[in-house]
């Protein structure tokens, strides 16, 4: 993907085509890829305020905030609808991005929506066809996404390109987002997006676990109907008894060379024992448990817990923690253990907090209530998560 002039320069000018972020495993807002190291998402004022006043101690546990951009709908030469961003002044050079380009990923999304390879994509047709999308059925069950299989699809310029495997959840969110924009706003309306660090850019096969943290998920400004809906979800899931539930995951299976994906509907149904088994599955590559990942993950979670305990007045309602590691098989050496683990290089893992649209703290512009002390629900969830991972570690 590069910054390029459209042939319809008078109407469009320079812009950065945004592609669905193919490693989005949870959430309901569409996350889009701006370049190899940057993603963007619809701007929510409370989340922007959080990033702009972020405590220093939390910066290593959150994506780097890179500012905001304006985004608009745009049709390509074939009439297909996409999103394009005004480029940042410091990023006017061509971008280096992954092979899963917008021409492939967005084409796949819109073909699922319209069911036609040659017809344009009218706004009304796009909105109607969302209800008929097979993607929703696919997302209700387990799915394996091959990174070897490479069916040919047609790119924007008519050439044949390979489509690599991807998580369907990001396409589902992108499709829903396009439909909302189409139905609620004129095509030429400008939308503001947050620019954030792509926290998985350094991983070859990013394994990602999205954990919704805390015993409460609704914000202070939620309507009574929304409060009741979120309270019911918490009561019927591990959010109530553990303070944490699975919101999505993808884990690379080395034996099948594919990602095993789970979505939020799977996570809501899990019992405490099911949650424990899902954590084990997240650390299993299809042939063995990646036991060497447990200690670095636990150290990182323990460090996060220490930071959260020190943040008075913060309530991270509906926020998530991402646990990330590389599913690329580690290189073995002559000094490797019997399990085939490299004896030298440490396992590359990360833990990041994301999604702060409903986070409140003293000084936030629309605070309804000022809380005292750290977030008890978030701490409860982290403590239980650490305890379960310790049990898995000791069991191995």
Swiss-Prot record:
Pfam (any one): IPK
UniProt-listed PANTHER family: INOSITOL HEXAKISPHOSPHATE KINASE 3, INOSITOL POLYPHOSPHATE KINASE
Keywords noted in UniProt: ATP-binding, Cytoplasm, Kinase, Nucleotide-binding, Transferase
Recorded family membership: Belongs to the inositol phosphokinase (IPK) family.
GO molecular function: ATP binding; inositol hexakisphosphate 5-kinase activity; inositol hexakisphosphate 6-kinase activity
Subcellular locations according to the entry: Cytoplasm
Entry keyword Secreted: no
Keyword Acyltransferase: no
Binding site for substrate: 206-214
Example of a GO cellular component annotation carried by this entry: nucleus
Expressed in which tissues: Highly expressed in cerebellum, brain cortex, kidney, thymus and lung. Detected at lower levels in hippocampus, testis, heart and olfactory bulb.
GO biological process: inositol phosphate biosynthetic process; locomotion; phosphatidylinositol metabolic process
InterPro entries: IPK, IPK_sf
Name this polypeptide is given: Inositol hexakisphosphate kinase 3
Segments traversing the membrane: none
Catalytic function, reaction form: 1D-myo-inositol hexakisphosphate + ATP = 5-diphospho-1D-myo-inositol 1,2,3,4,6-pentakisphosphate + ADP; 1-diphospho-1D-myo-inositol 2,3,4,5,6-pentakisphosphate + ATP + H(+) = 1,5-bis(diphospho)-1D-myo-inositol 2,3,4,6-tetrakisphosphate + ADP
Enzyme Commission number: 2.7.4.21
Function: Converts inositol hexakisphosphate (InsP6) to diphosphoinositol pentakisphosphate (InsP7/PP-InsP5). Converts 1,3,4,5,6-pentakisphosphate (InsP5) to PP-InsP4.
